[in-house]
Amino acid sequence: MTTASRLPVGPGERVLDLCAAPGGKATALGAKLFGEGLLVANDISASRVKALLKNIEVMGIPNSFLLNEVPAKIAEQFPAYFDKILVDAPCSGEGMFRKNPEAARVWSEEKPPECAKMQKEIVKQAISMLKPGGMMIYSTCTFSPEENEQIIAWVLREFPEMQLIPMKGYEGFSEGRPDLADGNPELKKCVRIWPHHMDGEGHFVALMQKSRTPEMDDVSPEKSSAYISEADEESSDHDDVKKKKKKAKKGRKDQKERNIQFG
């Protein structure tokens, strides 16, 4: 859940989880919306979407809809639409070998480059759906540089409007490795999570922001910075939303009691 906790989402935003099944990250993002805004959860696998649907329903995320589509088709309908996008990309799964021996059994030397090709296409489509000023978080559960630092280095070269954003770290977090890609020092802003450094599996995470345009001057950079520094904490706005909902619920209950008493 590190990926979902690092993406700063607030009520009223449009959020896309592009590779969402089975739904743990999607439901975490939906909870941050507090019933306001929109969550779009997509997965290309029809069988995995069933698990995604179940988890969305169980968690009661009302402002959401599910898709079972390739990213390119979604991008045709949602150009520059989303405030926040999460891409937990399909990968070679090297970080899961300890947890899932089957992942180690099916691994081959050809898998990382094959996955990297697919990841580039997914990321390209995700960037096209991201609003100027919006944020995208990319993650994998593999150690392979081809799928991690080299993907982000490619993004920085091919999409100059994208820039890496540093994330708040925890014990066990390690910096990205520029030496495993093109040497760009910006790659240190990525995060590697090693299973022998903390309790968990191997992961890679990178948070990026799309350059703003003059039309977006009403959204202050300070707001983005505040979100980043407190990505896993509830804001005062969240508390206000909960208080308003609680007050409205109490009002409806009182009205119902009066109707019973005098009706």
What are the residue ranges of the model-derived segments?
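S-adenosylmethionine
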Residues: 1-263
